[in-house]
Design a protein with these regions (language model features):
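Hydrophobic or amphipathic, alpha-helical segments that drive membrane association/targeting
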Residues: 1-140, 165, 279-325
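Short helix/loop segments within enzyme catalytic domains
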Residues: 27-28, 32, 114-120, 207-268, ...
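Loop-to-transmembrane-helix entry motif
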Residues: 53-57, 178-185, 277
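Active-site scaffold of zinc-dependent metalloenzymes
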Residues: 142-168
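Active-site His/Glu-centered metal-binding helix of metallohydrolases
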Residues: 175-183, 220, 224
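Catalytic Zn2+-binding segment of zinc metalloproteases
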Residues: 178-201, 229
Length: 325
């Protein structure tokens, strides 16, 4: 297919961004246990913010490397500014990468629109002293969650309220959990991550990076809700069990931070509440921390050297890429 100079440049940029981001996404998943281990002494909230930031960073870094290095290098070396035949495989790869991003953005916009419509069906709020945002009662689902983006609301199901499933003290701790989600803008973070495509690598022992972030966000909200109080930790554990018994399988696609969004995390969260792990990694094992830092510096230096080598040979490689198929 014949394409003009600027369309060739657009295809090349799309392919470069897509390939680099996928490689960075795969690398992030591979090193995610090392990141979590390295941040062990920093606390749950620091881990949550790091996992959120690194997922955004894979896309930003892919764009920066493409537009600051690869595209200018191609423009400096390219002499043909007229139409040129481009391979169909290259065009298909560029179209697939564009569709990957477009699908993610469309999915996020759809969920946002459904959340707005769901908000409009809520009745009048009622007062709970512990709540920092308006509280509403819903028929069934979600049992207890923070719903919304710019003006989030806490929703509680009638089953939890009318059947007295939760004592007042337990309800206060659950509300404190949702208050933490509201203060840390976890729904906004979820929307931003939903706007971006993810490779979604996972195994039975290691979930995807997105799921790891979601689990860390819940653990961080648990910690904010209970603080150092063993009594509040027990109350929140009991609340999680009560919510698990009332959770419906008919999940609506809305922006929400539910008290128990993933039932498979129930055991892990209860273990963290009842048997918190002391944060002694930085003090007790400085040698291991030094080895990890040295390894990270080595990997980073190797990646920079490899990328510099690719940039130096980028024009002939880009020509081969453009003529695939």
């Amino acid at each position: 297919m014949l394409l003009s100079y600027w369309w060739r440049l657009a295809c090349l940029a799309l392919v470069s961004i897509g390939v680099i981001q996928i490689l960075l996404d795969a690398l992030l998943w591979l090193v995610s246990p090392v990141i979590a281990r390295f941040l062990e002494a920093a606390g749950i909230r620091a881990k949550e913010r790091t996992f959120f930031t690194t997922q955004i960073a894979t896309h930003l870094l892919a764009c920066m490397l493409t537009f600051l290095f690869l595209v200018p290098q191609y423009m400096r070396r390219e002499t043909n500014l007229e139409q040129e035949r481009v391979g169909i495989l290259c065009i298909l790869i560029a179209a697939a990468i564009f569709a990957r991003y477009a699908h993610a953005v469309l999915r996020a916009l759809t969920i946002s629109a459904q959340t707005i419509r769901w908000h409009r069906r809520l009745g009048a709020p009622f007062f709970l002293p512990a709540a920092e945002v308006p509280v509403f009662c819903v028929p069934a689902h979600p049992p207890l969650a923070l719903v919304g983006l710019l003006s989030p609301r806490i929703v509680i199901s009638k089953a939890l309220l009318k059947e007295k499933s939760l004592p007042p003290a337990a309800l206060d701790v659950a509300i404190a959990h949702e208050n933490s989600h509201a203060r840390n803008r976890d729904n906004l973070k979820l929307l931003l991550l939903s706007c971006l495509p993810h490779l979604g690598l996972k195994t039975a022992r290691r979930p995807s990076v997105l799921r790891q972030w979601q689990s860390l966000a819940e653990l961080a909200a648990d910690y904010d809700a209970v603080g150092e109080s063993p009594v509040r930790a027990v109350l929140l554990a009991e609340t999680l069990l009560a919510v698990a018994r009332t959770t419906s399988q008919n999940h609506q696609r809305i922006l929400s931070a539910a008290l128990l969004p993933h039932e498979e995390d129930l055991q892990n969260r209860i273990n963290h509440l009842l048997c918190p792990t002391p944060l002694t990694f930085a003090q007790d094992r400085p040698a291991e921390r030094l080895i990890m830092m040295s390894g990270a510096v080595f990997v980073l230096a190797t990646a920079i050297a490899l990328f510099a080598y690719i940039v130096s040979l980028w024009h002939p490689f880009a020509e081969c890429l453009l003529h695939l198929g």
